[in-house]
Every structure is written in C-alpha cells, then in structure tokens.
C-alpha cells in the first residue's frame, strides 16, 4: 500500500546518493534481470494478460486510476491479476465501506464489481489473483493477517455487477503473513506472494518472497496453506532508505516471475525496478 510513501517521495525528491547493492537470496528463484519501473504508472503491480488476439503485460500505478473511479472515492489501486483472458484491478476507498474490482473481459468490455465490507474485514484491497481455472478471485488486506480472502470470480462465476460481490471463503496460512502486496498462482495449489514486511520477525528476513502451498485447489470452502519464506527480494538503488516491495506476476507460459520493487527517496523516479526471476 505505497500511495502515501510514494507521494511523499515525489514531493520531496531529495535523497543521499550512494552505491547500491542487490542483496537477494530467493532460493531456487534466480534473478534473470530487471526493467525500470516508472513511479506514476508502474508502481503498484502488473499482470500478464493472455488472449487469442495477443498478449501483453499491464501495470497499475497512482496515475492509472480512471478519473471517474477516483471521483467515486476509489483512491488506491493494487496489484492486478489475470487468467483466461480476464484482467482484474483491485480498488479500495477510505470512505466507501466497500472494495471494488474493475474487470475487463477477453472481448475488451469493462465491468465494475463492488464488495461490501464484512464486519471483520479491513478496507485494504492490496492485490487480485485469479485461480488457474478462472473460477475464484483471491485478494489480501494490509498488516499482519491469518487469511487471504476469496470471492467468486467476477465476470465468470459471479456475473451481476449491480449486486454485492459476496465473500466466499478464505485461504488460511499456517503462519501469519504481513503486508502482502501481491500474489499469483504458479499452480492450482501454490501461490507466490511478495511481502513488504519491514520488521523481519515473522520469518527472520525483511521484504521476503513467500510461497504458500495449499492443502488443495480452491473449491468453495476454506483451504489451509503452508507458508515458506524463500528469502529477501532484491533491494538495489543509488539511494539509501526504505524500499517498498510492490506487486508481482507469474507468467505461466515461460515460468517468468516478475516483482516490482520501488526505490527510496528521489530514486523512486530513477531506478525503481521490475525484477525478473526463473526457477532453477
């Protein structure tokens, strides 16, 4: 949830410039390289959209929120997700008492689905991850949590945008997870997640790449998940300060994992990166 931190960095635009080092040890996920991540329109996350007429990578950022949605109070967009040609952007609001998912169908048509918050539910809507069968939508809240939320996939399993998108069930990790910025399925029973955890007490490492092995495919009832920390994501910049790990994407076509990491201070503009990994 980097909107305030990013806005402050853009306003101040001052930092101490020093050489940076990429300290990443993410187990079998080996760095293949990186691409510049623009601060305004590539700072929240990304999704690989695969369609018969062509495939593309779609990013989200603070400048990609449609004006009409911003006017309705949807003031933050998270890490998007995609599967079977459907593309989903997650939105949150400080005042609407709801979350919104903006969905583009394979034919290019857009719809908006609103979920009214449950009494126990946080307002955060950090990411959207679609199950491999296209039937379920997974999202996450901010802070330390013992759940990921699952909804019927809007546009596929739930097709009435004018009705409340219902909460369906949860993924229940066997270990608390903190500040999850993005998740994506690598199979029907495995998620990879990017965590912006700056404390490090949960897994002994800050800013980790997490692996969640599910007890079974999503099928309409709670599933448990074994959580493993695979190591710290790369933190490389010419500036000192606090990095922000953002969203992620797994491209099932070639096994490429991409994770956005925004740089500290002024360098948020100059050397933020989308890191590319492959499993060795």
Named regions from a protein language model:
Residues 55-56, 66, 95-103, 144-153, ...:
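Structural motif
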Residues 221-252:
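Conserved blade-ending motifs and adjacent loop-strand segments that build the rim/top face
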Residues 32-62, 71-81:
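Beta-strand-rich domains and repeat architectures in extracellular enzymes and scaffolds
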Residues 1-24:
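Secretory targeting and sorting signals
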Residues 34-41, 68-73, 115-122, 170-176, ...:
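Surface loop/turn motifs at the tips and blade-to-blade linkers of beta-strand repeat domains
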Residues 40-45, 74-80, 125, 177-183, ...:
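Signature of short aromatic-glycine-proline-rich micro-motifs recurring in repeat-based ectodomains
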